[in-house]
Amino acid sequence: VGGLNPTAVEMAARGGVKLVWFPTCDNEHEMAYQFDGNPNKKRAFWASIILEMREEGIQTPTINCLDEKGELKKEVLDILDIIARYDMILATGHISHEEAYKLVPEAAKRGVKKIVITHVSFPTTYYSVEDQKMFVSYGAKCEHCYTTWKTGKAEFDTIAEMIREVGAENCIIGTDLGNTKLCYPDEGMEEFAQKLL
């Protein structure tokens, strides 16, 4: 479900959904990075789909969690309350640092117990070790993905060092696979886990 839609989140929660991602490829910050005018940039796989949609005349509006005053939008606050009420997992998606610095403390304040800081070593969602530790202080877990390393967006040693410094108990690993040009998710997870060992 796209957008910041509390009703959709409520209905999803009632249907048993356990995880809510905040905006990813349609986030204003992510779109600005992917489409910054650099013709030589190696874009994310999904960016080619956005370009195809635009060529077909399909609108691709962007989403920001903050209002014009730099505060979290009311819809975001409503979504946080729903996540807390149903004990769902909040994943930060590809939101900007400014959005995350507001979202995570507010989520914790409103009773969200399960928070994932998505792709902490990915270029657009990269967080320093200090930032990661700050998020952990709110109960968050920091996610590291196979594809970030495997596609050359981060050095493996950087990821491993982040995990050591933040603490393995405060980190989770995933693959971020599903792209048909790469391996299957289970294969990626196995390779990533083996390399981390």
Language model features with spans:
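Short acidic/histidine-rich active-site segments
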Residues: 145, 168-185
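Active-site metal-binding loops of divalent metal-dependent hydrolases
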Residues: 1, 25-26, 95, 120-122, ...
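His/Asp/Glu-enriched short active-site or ligand-binding loop at hydrolase and phosphoryl-transfer sites
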Residues: 139-151
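Divalent metal-coordination and catalytic microenvironments
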Residues: 20, 24, 90, 142, ...
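Glycine/Thr-rich phosphate-binding loops of Rossmann-like dinucleotide-binding domains
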Residues: 30, 151, 181
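Short, glycine-/Ser/Thr-/acidic-enriched flexible segments
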Residues: 27, 147-149, 178
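A generic, well-ordered mixed alpha/beta core segment in the N-terminal half of proteins
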Residues: 2-33
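Histidine/acidic residue-rich metal-binding segments in metalloenzymes
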Residues: 6-16, 36-116, 124-140, 154-173, ...
